[in-house]
């Protein structure tokens, strides 16, 4: 079974996966990457109004086979903005 590596970027730091996990296909890797994004966002809430979280998936040869991103945008409602 192929091994995939999930590198994460939270807007401030890149964490490279050196262990990886064995999955049946790139499609299964896509599902795992999508599941990881909400956890990344929860662990590193945006300091400002917007932040993008990225999971890059590499195969055993080191080639990026897919990339998933989640952007969190925080906007204050017009009635609640400071004057």
Predicted regions located by residue number:
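Short aromatic-glycine-(Arg/Gly/Cys) micro-motifs in beta-strand/loop hairpins
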Residues: 1-16
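Long, contiguous binding/interaction regions
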Residues: 22, 42, 81-82
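A short, structured loop/turn motif at beta-sheet edges
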Residues: 1, 23-28, 59-63
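A short, exposed loop/beta-hairpin motif centered on an aromatic-Gly-Thr core
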Residues: 15-24
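Charged, amphipathic alpha-helical segments
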Residues: 30-43
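C-terminal structural segments of small proteins and small subunits
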Residues: 46-83
């Amino acid at each position: 079974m192929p091994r995939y590596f999930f590198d994460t970027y939270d807007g401030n730091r890149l964490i490279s996966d050196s262990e990886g996990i064995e999955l049946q296909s790139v499609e299964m890797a896509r599902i795992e990457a999508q599941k990881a994004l909400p956890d990344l966002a929860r662990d590193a809430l945006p300091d400002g109004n917007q932040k993008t979280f990225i999971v890059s998936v590499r195969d055993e040869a080191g080639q990026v086979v897919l990339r998933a991103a989640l952007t969190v945008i925080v906007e204050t409602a017009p009635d609640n903005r400071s004057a």
